Amino acid sequence: MNAILLDARGGAVEKQTVTPRRVRLTRAAVDRLAELTGVPSPFASVPAPVGGAAGDLVGRLGDNVPAPAVPVADLDEALVAASLVADGVPTEEGRAVLAVWHAPALAVELEVLVRLRRGTVRVRSWHRNLDDWVVCLSTGDGLAFELTWLAAEDWWLELGRAAHVDLATLRESEYAAPLPAVVETPWELLLATGEAVRRHRTELFDVMVADHSGTTLAGDSPRMLETAADADVRLWHEQLESDSRGRLHAAVMGRDRRGRPGAGIVEWVLLGDGWRSLTPVTRDGWTMVRIERRSVVDLPRELAVRAAEVTS
C-alpha cells in the first residue's frame, strides 16, 4: 500500500517521476517549504519510521547554533531557485519531496566523523525511500543543508558518496604495514585493548593478548584465515585504536511484512589506508568481531543486506 500525503486543503499529493536534483538550503528555507506545503518540517519531532521514540531531527544535529534571521522573501527566492516553489506555492516536485520524507518505507541515517590534517569533520545524512523516490538531507554544521532527491535505482551512488574520503587529506600512519585484509578477534579483547590505549596503559597489552592467545585469526578473506601470532595481535589492536582516523555509523530502519519495526546497523572505522568494517560474528562460543577492509562501493551493499533483513 502506497502512503498518501494530504496538503493543507486536504487534497492528495501525487508523487511524480523523479528528476534528480541536488540543492543547498538553510534550515529556515526547508522549514519555509514545509510551511507552504502544509506539512510538518523535517526538523520537527515526528514518529520514527520504525515506531517507538520520536525522531527529533533537531535534537540530533549537535550544537544548535542560532541561525541569523532571514526575510521570508529571501527564503522564497531560494526555494524558487531550487524549483521547489513557483508563484508562491510549492511545485509538484516540492510536494513530492516532503511526501516521501514524511512517509518512508525505508530510512537510512548516516554519521561520518573524519579527523583530517586540518581538523575534524562530522557529516550527518538522513535518507528516506518510498517507491521509486529517495530524498536525502545532509549537513556538516546543522545550519546549511544539502537536499537531494533521486531515483531509487541510483540510491547506491549517493550512499557510496557519503563514505568517500580522500586519504591524502589524512595524517600519515605511524605504522609500517597496514592491517591484514581480514582480522577476526574476540570482541572483549578489542574493547579492552582500545580502553588501554585511550588510558595510555599499553603495558597491559601482553597480558590481555596472552589471555586470548590463539583466538585471533587473520588472512586475505573470511574463508582463508589462520591463527595469528600474539605479537601481531598486540600490534594490530594497538594500531586499530592509535591509527584510527574516523568512523562511520549507519542505521537502516523499516518494517517487515507483518508490519513489525526493525533496524540494522553498519559500523566502520577509518584507518590510514582506508575503511574497515566491524561485524559481530560467533565462533566456538566466542563473541568475535570481524574487521574487514572495505571501499566506498561496499557501503551500499552492506546497507542493502541490512535492509533485506529488516523488511523480510
Protein language model features and the residues they cover:
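Accessory beta->alpha helical hairpin/"wing" motif in late/C-terminal subdomains of nucleic-acid enzymes
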Residues: V72-A73, E77, A82-A162, W286
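Low-complexity, intrinsically disordered/propeptide-like segments
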Residues: A8-R9, V207, A251, R306
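Charged, compositionally biased non-catalytic regions
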Residues: L61-R95, E174-D230, A307-S312
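Extended, Lys/Arg-enriched charged tracts that mediate electrostatic binding to polyanionic substrates
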Residues: E92-D132, D220-I265
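Short, amphipathic alpha-helical interface elements at domain boundaries
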Residues: N2-V80, L84-D87, R95-A96, A103
